[in-house]
Amino acid sequence: ISADGVCVSPWKPFIGASRAVVIDNKGQKHNVEALMGANGIYDIVKFQIQSSTTPAALATNVTANSNAWIVTTSKSYPPAKAMVTKVEKFMEKYNYSVLTTDVDDKLNGAIVANDKGQVIGLYSSNNSIKSATDAAFARDFVISGLSQNDLTLRECAIRVALPASVEEATIALMLSADKSESYRDGAIKEFLGKFPTLNDGYLANANLLITKN
C-alpha cells in the first residue's frame, strides 16, 4: 500500500509467529521487518518489509451490485469473479463489503478489486459469509510508544515498528530493553536510522553490546 514496503494482509497467520516471509507477484521473498498495527476482529495487519514496492490503488467508494474480482499472486488461481451485494460502513468511514462468489477460504487474504483494478479490500470466507475488509482501515493504523503492550500485537513475536515522532519512538526504544536480543537489535537499528543525531540509540546499542559480552 506504499512505495516503501508497507503492506497489509490477514492477521491470523501472524499469531504465534516469530518471523514471517511474504512472496510478491514476481516470486521474490521478503522478510517482515516489523509490525505496524493489527486488528483481530477484522483479521488484518499492517507491516513493513525492506523493499521498494508499487503501491496498490485503494478504492475510495464501493457500491452494492457492482462487480469485483478476487486476485492472488499465484498462477494456480486465475482472477475469480464476485459480486458486491451489500456495503456496510464501520468506524464511520471504512467499507465492509459482503460478496457473492464461489471462491472458498483457500483464497482468504487475496485482493478483492473492482473493474478499475482498485483494491476494495482483503477477501475472507467464513462459513457462509464472504466479504472484503477495507484495506484503508489497516493503512490508517498508527502505532505509539506503548504499542508493544497492545494485546493483539503481543500475540506475535515479530518486532513492533517504532512510531514516527521522536518522543513516542524513544518510549518504544526504552520498552524494548526487556525484549529478546534480536528484537532490541532491530529496534535500535530502526531508531538510529530515523534519528541518527540522538544519543538514545547509541546508548541503547552500547548497553546491548555489553549484555552480549
Regions found by a protein language model. Name each.
Residues 121-190:
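C-terminal cap/linker of serine protease catalytic domains
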Residues 2, 15, 61-65, 113-114:
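Short, well-ordered loop/turn sites that connect or cap secondary structure elements
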Residues 1, 5, 9, 45-47, ...:
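Terminal peptide-recognition signature
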Residues 53-108, 123-134, 149:
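Flexible, gly/ser-rich surface segments that form the specificity/activation loops bordering the active-site cleft
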Residues 36, 120-121:
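A structural microfeature
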Residues 185-188, 201-213:
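Alpha-helical protein-protein interaction scaffolds
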Residues 193-203:
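Short solvent-exposed coil/turn linkers within tandem alpha-helical repeat scaffolds
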Residues 2-42, 136-137:
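Catalytic-histidine neighborhood of serine endopeptidases
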